[in-house]
Regions:
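N-terminal type II signal-anchor transmembrane helix
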Residues: 1-51, 56, 634-648, 652-653
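Terminal hydrophobic membrane-targeting helix
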Residues: 23-139, 290-293, 297, 601
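Intrinsically disordered, low-complexity segments enriched in small/polar residues
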Residues: 68, 359-383
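Small-residue helix/turn framework positions
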Residues: 77-100, 123-143, 162-171, 179-305, ...
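Short aromatic-glycine motifs in intrinsically disordered, low-complexity regions
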Residues: 94-98, 112-120, 147-156, 414, ...
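Short boundary motifs at domain starts and secondary-structure transition points
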Residues: 154-156, 379-386
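Short, cationic low-complexity segments
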Residues: 371, 531, 620-636
Length: 654
């Protein structure tokens, strides 16, 4: 028994010695063998692991290594292999077109554990690259060249603990997104002259960005965390970047999860530029031409699972300004079929329509349009309306456009579906009254069809004309209804083909007598009123009934009826040619001294109309006065006296 035990000990000792000798021999072999002779074997093994062609065109060395001093003692001295290879390339799959290679480097210094290889796990503890060039590509079929197998779960798993490089040229091409970006990346310790706002911790690299996104060029700079955070499943990549996307200035900061497990993320996004319309080349969202804007908020993206290709975007708690208008709210961009959907809720304390639709007249003047045209002939672009559907709710406490006249409590809901745009409902308060309306614009045919309907109730005249001191004594109210429809792809074309009508009525009240007397050129009363006080006269009513056909607005009735006079306006307005042709005929109810009351006319283009009395009646009265002056000075005043008439009360007819 004792003899057998000694024999077993000898066998065990010889076995241990043999293993130790084998290990020593293997260690000596690894350390002293010229591994250049084994490059075909090495590259074949690596190619089998990555399922991609691997080439080593320079020297190759294999040696033993241990972990850095930062590792725990329990793992630091476990033997691991270190591979140093020069001129290394990793090939691309046959379908890739962006570049011949996925990656290439002047040298690769890689240390990895041995035992995990038995479990088909490639644990790379340290990877140092010199001048790496990496081209990542996702094709139209959403295949990724950095994915080394088509199997849902690859046979081999790769884990990289530490990554270092001197300078990396990284290109990312995404065919479905129409994205092609290049990142010129260096360690942050060598960074110089990069100015990025907002603090993000753990920034280790800096990069310059260039390329294109859809139809917009991209140019900027950024800083980020360890690139290893983009490679491992549980990685995180802090990021901040600033630059131009097309004409828009973009500031981005936050933390990205690993792309390998990317289901959702959230970043802080700031945008600024000359016009919201400049976002279209990158976003394909047809926003209007506006005044300069700036906005900042939280951008988040989410998808259903790792295989989903559609992302839903949410821009939360954004706030900023467009021109002199403040804006805040939330927006969602949802990928749906047959078109994406934009949903937004926008609030404003002060909104200026000129900021959202800048002066089209000025834009057209720069384009060389005729100076006597005031209606915009700038073409709408309804083709862009097919890019998405939309549901947008806008509320504003105050809307300022005309001097001293403001709208309050504006609210409208914009719907866009299949190139049919509706604004319904549309509500706002004006001049202590209320305006309700509805607008439809149908771009499903070559020439857009538009229809607008507005109803105004109980608008106070003194609030409608706050700049006229003589109007402040008025307590009349305006009620009106307008309905117009037209066809065309510009404001000018829509009005040139307009059909519909406008009806309005001013209720009984008081208006400034000076306005009426000045309209009739009653010189004596006008001077008296200016010197001694602007008296008020009783307004029976004012009535307007305008019929619009084929762009011609005919005044069926336009009458202002007071206790003192009746003012009748007849004629028409040519909306196609932008021409006025109106007669204004005042008729006195009372005796007037020194009256030059005579019919007026308003003729000419919208941009510079001529408003004056007809010279015939005025000259006849002046000539008669001159002739009578030769007979008697008192008689000379007779032609300037208006005897007045017994006129019917127009309001009784309405």
């Amino acid at each position: 028994m004792h003899h057998r035990f000694l024999l077993l000990l000898r066998i065990l000792a010889w076995t241990m010695a043999a293993l130790a000798g084998l290990a020593a021999a293997l260690a000596l072999f690894v350390a002293n063998y010229n591994w250049n002779h084994a490059k075909p074997w090495l590259t074949q093994r690596f190619s089998e692991v990555l399922q991609r062609e691997i080439r080593i065109d320079g020297d190759a060395q294999l040696a033993w290594a241990h972990g850095p001093d930062t590792e725990p003692t329990s793992t630091r001295f476990i033997p691991r292999l270190r591979l140093l290879a020069r001129d290394v390339t990793i090939g691309n799959p046959s379908w890739a077109t962006a570049d011949q290679h996925l990656a290439r480097a002047a040298s690769v210094d890689m240390t990895f554990d041995l035992l995990p290889l038995l479990r088909q796990r490639w644990n790379i503890t340290d990877l140092h690259l010199v001048q790496p060039v990496i081209v990542l590509e996702r094709d139209a079929e959403r295949r990724k060249n950095w994915r080394f197998t088509d199997r849902p779960e690859p046979r081999w798993s790769v884990d990289i603990r530490r990554l270092a490089f001197d300078h990396a040229d990284i290109r990312y091409v995404d065919r479905p997104l129409d994205l092609d970006l290049r990142f010129d990346t260096t360690p942050l310790s060598g960074a110089a002259g990069v100015h990025i706002k907002d603090d993000v911790n753990d920034l280790l690299v800096q990069f310059g960005i260039s390329g294109k996104f859809r139809d917009a060029t991209v140019d900027g700079a950024g800083q980020g965390g360890a690139l290893i955070g983009l490679l491992n499943d549980d990685g995180r990549f802090p990021l901040r970047a600033e630059g131009k996307v097309g004409k828009t200035h973009v500031v981005l900061s936050g933390v990205l999860p690993s792309p390998r497990r990317l289901l959702e993320f959230e970043l802080k996004l700031g945008l600024s530029g000359d016009s919201l319309a400049d976002l279209y080349p990158a976003t394909r969202v047809p926003l209007p031409a506006t005044a300069p804007f700036q906005v900042s908020g939280q951008l988040s993206g989410a998808r259903a699972d790792l295989t989903a290709t559609q992302w839903d975007w949410h821009y939360r708690k954004f706030a900023g300004s467009i021109g002199h208008s403040d804006i805040r709210g939330e927006a969602q961009y949802l990928q749906r079929e047959p078109r994406p959907i934009l949903r937004a809720t926008i609030q404003s304390d002060k909104l200026m329509p000129g900021d959202l639709v800048p002066s089209l007249g000025q834009q057209e003047k720069r384009r060389g349009s005729k100076p006597d045209r005031t209606l915009s002939s700038r073409q709408f672009d309804p083709e862009k309306w097919d890019a998405m559907d939309a549901d947008i709710t806008v509320t504003a406490q105050r809307v300022e456009q005309l001097p001293k006249i403001a709208l309050q409590d504006l609210r409208f809901v914009l719907h866009l579906k299949d190139r049919l745009l509706t604004i319904d409902p549309l509500h706002f308060a004006l001049a202590e009254g209320r305006v309700d309306g509805r607008v439809t614009m149908d771009a499903r045919q070559k020439q857009m069809r538009a229809q607008a309907e507005l109803e105004a109730q109980a608008l106070r005249l003194r609030k409608l004309f706050p700049s006229l001191a003589s109007m402040q004594g008025s307590f009349g109210q305006l009620d009106a209804h307008a309905r117009l429809a037209g066809t065309g792809n510009s404001i000018a074309a829509l009005l040139a083909s307009a059909e519909g009508g406008v009806k309005a009525r001013v209720s009984e009240g008081a208006v400034s007598k000076f306005i009426l007397e000045a309209a009739g050129l009653n010189v004596a009363d006008a001077v008296f009123a200016k010197l001694y006080r602007d008296r008020q006269v009783h307004l029976n009513c004012a009535v307007a009934d305008i019929d619009v056909k084929a762009g011609q607005a005919h005044f069926k009735q336009f009458v202002v009826d007071t206790d003192d006079a009746v003012i009748d306006v007849t004629g028409h307005i040519d909306l196609a040619q932008e021409q006025l042709d109106l007669d204004i005929r005042p008729q006195s109810r009372e005796l007037r001294v020194f009256t030059l009351r005579t019919p007026l006319y308003a003729k000419g283009p919208f941009s510079k109309p001529e408003i004056a009395p007809y010279k015939g009646p005025l000259l006849a009265r002046a000539g008669a006065a001159a002739a009578l002056a030769l007979v008697a000075p008192v008689a000379a005043a007779l032609p300037l006296i208006s005897m007045g008439k017994e006129l019917p009360n127009v309001c009784a007819q309405h």
